[in-house]
Design a protein with these regions (language model features):
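Conserved catalytic SET/PR domain of SAM-dependent protein methyltransferases, capturing the structural core
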Residues: 1-113
Length: 113
């Protein structure tokens, strides 16, 4: 992915919002149109020691036994699963895989790419 200017966590609410999802529970939605390849935000929160709700695990491509977990504390914790999703993580940074229209749910493939 091409690196884009980082969106401050405080600005995340200018890009996305949470609402009732048709996929599952609460979902994350585009507050404005998001361009393909655009940086959406970073999954913030404390390090996780074990799996649980809102924990995102990032695996080292060279060593899948070496994973870092983060317990989500910002709006990105409401991302739901879809296969294929319309966004993907590069580390803890979320990028749009394609153009995401306003009010469309933002999803990613929990199984990775």
């Amino acid at each position: 992915m091409a690196f884009k200017r980082r969106v401050k966590n405080s600005d995340l609410r200018e890009i996305v919002y949470s609402a009732l999802s048709q996929v599952h529970g609460t979902g994350l939605f585009a507050k404005r149109a998001i361009k393909k390849g655009e940086y959406i935000g970073t999954y913030h929160g404390p390090d996780a020691k074990r799996d649980g709700t809102y924990v995102l695990w990032v695996f080292d491509k060279g060593d899948e036994g070496n994973a870092v977990g983060r317990s989500g504390r910002n709006l990105l914790r409401y991302l739901n699963h879809a296969k294929p999703g319309n966004a993907e993580f590069d580390g803890f940074d979320l990028y749009a895989l394609k153009r995401i229209p306003i009010d469309q749910e933002i999803t990613f493939n929990y199984e990775g790419s």
